[in-house]
Amino acid sequence: MRKGIQPALEQYLVTAGGGEGAAVVAAAAAASMDKRALLASPGFAAAAAAAAAPGAYIQILTTNTSTTSCSSSLQSGAVAAGPLLPSAPGAEQTAGSLLYTTPHGPSSRAGLLQQPPALGRGGSGGGGGPPAKRRLELGESGHQYLSDGLKTPKGKGRAALRSPDSPKTPKSPSEKTRYDTSLGLLTKKFIQLLSQSPDGVLDLNKAAEVLKVQKRRIYDITNVLEGIHLIKKKSKNNVQWMGCSLSEDGGMLAQCQGLSKEVTELSQEEKKLDELIQSCTLDLKLLTEDSENQRLAYVTYQDIRKISGLKDQTVIVVKAPPETRLEVPDSIESLQIHLASTQGPIEVYLCPEETETHSPMKTNNQDHNGNIPKPASKDLASTNSGHSDCSVSMGNLSPLASPANLLQQTEDQIPSNLEGPFVNLLPPLLQEDYLLSLGEEEGISDLFDAYDLEKLPLVEDFMCS
């Protein structure tokens, strides 16, 4: 204790639970009192016995006048821990068991030991620090360390003060949930207000009143929408919608759903077409690689003319190497075809219609000698009147090509027998014009004209003249 400073008098008040008990008032010098006098005093023991009820405790408020701590077990099994307390003069000293622990107890206070503030700046051991609080637990529980119902709560706020034994109270219907106050729901309501405006302009003050929210929450929505260019600030506290039409929201949704359904159907149809293309490609590959099919890999004139879709139409067959480019300009008056190839020559064939079942050749009767008589056509007779006649043998002529031979054909396609006669290029000659043979009574002189040799002039006459 500092010199020149009188020791501070300390006054203690012990109150039992329920307002009943005994009061012990002790006034003494802190330096000259016994260290364990208060706990062993009869008045303190009587107060402790009166406060020994379930959930009762005694709290002692002292100044840090001593650095030595002691504890004494009371009749109820409670623990007192704290600095040494001064006691009344003449108090008996009793030895008690010492135990240092952090006390636990119920929230209701049954006993209170208060100390008035010190009269001086400090005590004998002095530091002048804040008063220390110690609580004495006087419950009936035999365990003097921990209580399951009074563990340190892990929650925050109001949940920490609630006892775990008490059931959770259900929320009242009037209490709003977290979703009701969320910014997402508030944004939907704000968009609905914008859609109800005829020109898309909304007053923020009116929106805050209708939605019953603070204006700063409205600003949270408008800042985001303005950042993504969906609204713009028209004037003070007025914003205008810049997105798509909100009045046709239902129609746009139906249109989007219809487009999605159409895209799904087109995707399925495209998938079927891909499968068909793969199947046809595989079949074509098998047909082309087969040796038996390669021998018959051609198209005939009759095959083309048998197609019903090509009836009464002009058919042009094009035989071209791979990578040949075919262009057909879009012309209404005339039809043009442009062919271009860098791999080889291009062959084009015209497939006319056959008017007769047989080859288009004229039929003429032959005589008994096998000669073809002169045709009855006046045009041919007039045009060929200056030519000499001759007889034509059937066996010396080769067959002419028919329209079926316009396409390149294999040997098995060429007809072996021609039912119709051939076309005569010139009118046949009569037998009188040429002697094909001599009779038995004729000689070589009969091949020449007969002349009278006596009438011939002499050679001398030719020389003189």
Curated annotation (Swiss-Prot):
One of its GO terms (cellular component) is nucleoplasm. It is found in: Nucleus. Pfam families: E2F_CC-MB, E2F_TDP. The keyword Iron-sulfur does not apply. One of its GO terms (biological process) is G1/S transition of mitotic cell cycle. Residues 391-465 are annotated as: Transactivation. InterPro entries: E2F, E2F-DP_heterodim, E2F_CC-MB, E2F_WHTH_DNA-bd_dom, WH-like_DNA-bd_sf, WH_DNA-bd_sf. Residues 358-369, 380-389 have a biased composition (Polar residues). Residues 120-130 have a biased composition (Gly residues). It comes from the Eukaryota. Coiled coil: none annotated. Residues 163-172 have a biased composition (Low complexity). Residues 96-179, 357-389 are annotated as: Disordered. Residues 204-225 are annotated as: Leucine-zipper. GO terms for molecular function: cis-regulatory region sequence-specific DNA binding; DNA-binding transcription activator activity; DNA-binding transcription activator activity, RNA polymerase II-specific; DNA-binding transcription factor activity; DNA-binding transcription factor activity, RNA polymerase II-specific; protein dimerization activity; RNA polymerase II cis-regulatory region sequence-specific DNA binding; sequence-specific DNA binding. Residues 432-449 are annotated as: Retinoblastoma protein binding. Residues 155-245 bind DNA. Keywords: Activator, Cell cycle, DNA-binding, Nucleus, Transcription, Transcription regulation. Component of the DRTF1/E2F transcription factor complex. Binds cooperatively with TFDP1/Dp-1 to E2F sites. Interacts with retinoblastoma protein RB1 and related proteins (such as RBL1) that inhibit the E2F transactivation domain. Binds EAPP. Belongs to the E2F/DP family. Transcription activator that binds DNA cooperatively with DP proteins through the E2 recognition site, 5'-TTTC[CG]CGC-3' found in the promoter region of a number of genes whose products are involved in cell cycle regulation or in DNA replication. The DRTF1/E2F complex functions in the control of cell-cycle progression from G1 to S phase. E2F3 binds specifically to RB1 in a cell-cycle dependent manner. Inhibits adipogenesis, probably through the repression of CEBPA binding to its target gene promoters. This is Transcription factor E2F3. The lineage of its organism: Eukaryota, Metazoa, Chordata, Craniata, Vertebrata. The gene is E2F3.
